[in-house]
Swiss-Prot record:
Native organism: Malacoplasma penetrans (strain HF-2)
Family that this chain belongs to: Belongs to the universal ribosomal protein uS5 family.
Gene Ontology terms describing biological process: translation
Domain S5 DRBM, first and last residues per copy: 78-141
Alphabetized InterPro entries for the sequence: Ribosomal_Su5_D2-typ_SF, Ribosomal_uS5, Ribosomal_uS5_bac-type, Ribosomal_uS5_C, Ribosomal_uS5_N, Ribosomal_uS5_N_CS, Ribsml_uS5_D2-typ_fold_subgr
Name this polypeptide is given: Small ribosomal subunit protein uS5
Job of this protein: With S4 and S12 plays an important role in translational accuracy. Located at the back of the 30S subunit body where it stabilizes the conformation of the head with respect to the body.
Domain notes per entry: The N-terminal domain interacts with the head of the 30S subunit; the C-terminal domain interacts with the body and contacts protein S4. The interaction surface between S4 and S5 is involved in control of translational fidelity.
Pfam family, one: Ribosomal_S5
Annotated spans, Disordered: 1-69
Coiled coil, from the record: none
Length: 234
């Protein structure tokens, strides 16, 4: 008598499950991503589609620098002056931590000026930090042929407010404190100025530089009004 094999429905279900699992594993193997080793032939340099010229989108010219700022390496022959050094303290759980704060202004007397603030436990280190910060914060200031301003300006920063006026030849720099330091290092020779705000040295320096940057030459006024220089002077 031949043996007759009988299969129950439970055995059939188990066989179907095992076959489905095997098929699923096979599909997973086929669907796995294939990684290609990087070679010099198949690697391409990264390119931005939105910016094909690789220009930084921080300024109009694409240089990445803020307007009226100068690259550190392009300025030579800088003069340095320390506006002031004061003692500051910070209260913590362990007590008061005493430090020194130094404010420095640098310029080449050709329309380039910068300022910086440095803090440290020692005065020489604070001055060194202030000078380094000033070299990284250089600004371009406009000046006419007579080494004075094109027109009157008022610079504001915080509680600081500074009035600066052009003066006739031979007048000199009529100013005091940090304002005079900034004007002299910029290269101005005949200027009137007056402090209309608080006497904080840092705010006075910032207000002076902001006021000087507000100047506009006659050519700029002519282009803004769509006129020639003759029409403006008439």
């Amino acid at each position: 008598m031949e043996d007759i094999k009988t299969t129950t429905p439970e055995v059939k279900n188990e066989e179907n499950k095992t076959s489905e699992v095997k098929e699923g594993k096979a599909l997973e193997k086929n669907n796995k991503p294939h990684f290609v080793k990087a070679n010099s032939s198949n690697v391409k340099p990264f390119e931005r589609r939105s910016n094909p010229n690789n220009k930084k989108p921080f300024s109009k010219d694409g240089s990445g620098n803020k307007p009226n700022k100068i690259v550190k390496q392009s300025v030579t022959g800088l003069e340095e002056k320390i506006v002031g050094v004061k003692k500051i303290s910070k209260t913590t759980k362990g007590g008061r931590n005493m430090r020194f704060s130094a404010l420095a202004v640098i310029g080449d007397r050709k329309g380039n000026v910068g300022f910086g603030l440095g803090k440290s436990i020692e005065v020489p280190v604070a001055i060194r930090k202030a000078l380094k910060s000033a070299k990284n914060n250089m600004y371009k200031v406009k000046m006419n042929k007579n080494f004075t301003l094109y027109h009157e300006v008022i610079g504001k920063h915080g509680a600081g407010k500074v009035l600066i006026k052009p003066a006739p030849k031979g007048t000199g720099v009529i100013a005091g404190g940090p304002i005079k330091v900034v004007l002299e290092l910029c290269g101005f020779k005949d200027v009137y100025s007056k402090n209309l705000g608080k006497n904080t040295s840092l705010n006075m320096v910032r207000a002076t530089i902001k006021g000087l940057q507000m100047q506009k030459s006659p050519k700029e006024y002519a282009t803004l009004r769509d006129k020639t220089l003759k029409d403006i002077w008439e």
